[in-house]
Amino acid sequence: ALTLKRKIDASNKERTDMVEYIDSYFLQKYSGVAVKDSAKINSESPAWAIDRLSILALKIYHMNEEATRAEASQEHRDNCQAKLNVLLEQRTDLSTAIDDLLQDIENGDKFMKVYKQMKMYNDDELNPVLYQNKK
């Protein structure tokens, strides 16, 4: 179980590193924008929103598989289709929100910061379970 957890942690770190890399790209791209005095920060960076969009794409794929699975009952397929419809609406809304955020940043109406994630659970020096096991 610990080996699997470490693999999941490593995969999550790769994903987090990629999100931070994408945010660094956006930060560089919009570095010359004159930020308005009234500009506000968004609660989520563009790359973290894109990360959510990628997770949503996986949910849509798998829900569509269930909604069209021939051997499933009609009730199951109908329930999954209803869920799929919600996921598709979420994708539309999130895509629009990302487009709006990037436009707002480009116009100086919003600004962004890149925060490095500080995960403690996978750090031998910060996680009590890990540093106690080293003794």
Give residue ranges: language-model regions.
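Anionic, Ser/Thr-rich low-complexity intrinsically disordered regions
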Residues: 1-135
